[in-house]
Amino acid sequence: MIQAIELGKVAVLYGGNSSEREISLIGGRAVHAALCAAGIDAHLLDTGDPNRIWTLKDEHFSRAFVMLHGRGGEDGEIQAILQWLGIPYTGSRVLACALAMDKVVCKKVWQSAGLPVLADVLVTPESRFETLVEQLHCQDFVIKPALEGSSVGVSRVKNQEQLAAAIPFAGGARAKIMAEPWIVGRELTYGIVNDTVLPAIEIVAGNDHDFYDYDAKYHAANTQYLCPAPIDAALDARCREIAFAAFQAIGARGWGRVDMIVDAQNRPYLLEINLVPGMTTHSLVPMAAQQIGMDFSALVQSILAQTLTS
């Protein structure tokens, strides 16, 4: 385990101004508590005030643990500021964060690397359901904002009326919105810490949810998390390989989580990658880490230790 004196004064960056602020606040507090319990000189810093980040040098912070989700914190913006300030920080660098944040661009990178992804098309307020049917060759879609996380603004659409409601829910005319085919299958997620792919988790939403949406993630009591996922060894090996290749393809480093869906024919498709995964009581990376004997404190310290060699 790392020595507290090696780390100096640590800023836990949390909060921010994205749609995922509340989740970031919870995760940031959990990380801060774990660091303090380990004797590390850690301090919470809410970047909801955009000027606050610029005081890190003046306040003699040695490094930063980034627990910001969504735009402004997970898209490369805060990472660029930290690099300019010369402060080591957890997780991926600017380009990888920017790629991961934009689901459309990220999928193009994965596709160019030969990794399996679902077809997608961009959606605007003028989009028609019949056109999407022709473009994606199916009659059941997922509509989602390309630049949000935590399943914010995601809808399942089966007709024009539902499409008309889904577009403003995903952000409307100002947002970059995408449509993908609805796949009936098993949702798997793989955490990655220090180039180690953690055991798979299968996510099973309750019968009252069509899919693993924001409510199922953070509020529903009947969402199941099966860890390790009950899948056969060959499929698990294939999915682990895909997850790590997806992580590497965008130049990610440190830690992250890769989400995918496996269809009825056991074909995996990448959905998205999260480079600042949640660290709440519902969060998946801590759950998977426990399966290899890494408790929350050890996980947090392992992630922070990456800043000593970055």
UniProtKB/Swiss-Prot annotation:
Which residues does the annotation say bind Mg(2+) 2? 272, 274
Q: What gene is it encoded by?
A: ddl
What is the protein name stated in its UniProt record?
D-alanine--D-alanine ligase
Q: Could you tell me which residue ranges the ATP-grasp domain spans?
A: 107-305
Question: What metabolic or biological pathway is this protein involved in?
Answer: Cell wall biogenesis; peptidoglycan biosynthesis
Main localization of the protein?
cytoplasm
Lineage, uppermost ranks: Bacteria, Pseudomonadati, Pseudomonadota, Gammaproteobacteria, Cardiobacteriales
| One BP term from GO | cell wall organization
**How are cofactors bound according to the entry's free-text note?**
Binds 2 magnesium or manganese ions per subunit.
NCBIfam families recorded: D_ala_D_alaTIGR (TIGR01205), PRK01372.1 (NF002378)
Q: Which UniProt keywords apply?
A: ATP-binding, Cell shape, Cell wall biogenesis/degradation, Cytoplasm, Ligase, Magnesium, Manganese, Metal-binding, Nucleotide-binding, Peptidoglycan synthesis
Where does the UniProt annotation locate this protein?
Cytoplasm
Source organism of the structure = Dichelobacter nodosus (strain VCS1703A)
